[in-house]
Amino acid sequence: MKARELKELKSSNPQDLTVKLGDLKAELFNLRFQLATGQLENPMRIREVKKSIAQIKTILREEELKALEQ
């Protein structure tokens, strides 16, 4: 994920991030299934999706902690 995309994610609301997180988890499931059946064309996509999931979870957690401080 590029820095520009990361800034866009940080500026979006938690509901949108949760929806995006669900979409990425579904995509990761499909990619793993394709890997197991030998149909996966781009194995690097798994790494990219996992990294995006981690970044979104981090953003959600940061917002949660920020809300607790206030």
From Swiss-Prot:
NCBIfam families, sorted: L29
Single GO biological process annotation from the record: translation
GO MF annotation: an example: structural constituent of ribosome
Record's protein name: Large ribosomal subunit protein uL29
GO cellular component: a single term: cytosolic large ribosomal subunit
Similarity field: Belongs to the universal ribosomal protein uL29 family.
Pfam families hit by this protein: Ribosomal_L29
Keywords, sorted A to Z: Ribonucleoprotein, Ribosomal protein
InterPro entries: Ribosomal_protein_uL29 (IPR050063), Ribosomal_uL29 (IPR001854), Ribosomal_uL29_CS (IPR018254), Ribosomal_uL29_sf (IPR036049)
Keyword Ribosomal protein: yes
HAMAP family to which the protein is assigned, alphabetical: Ribosomal_uL29 (MF_00374)
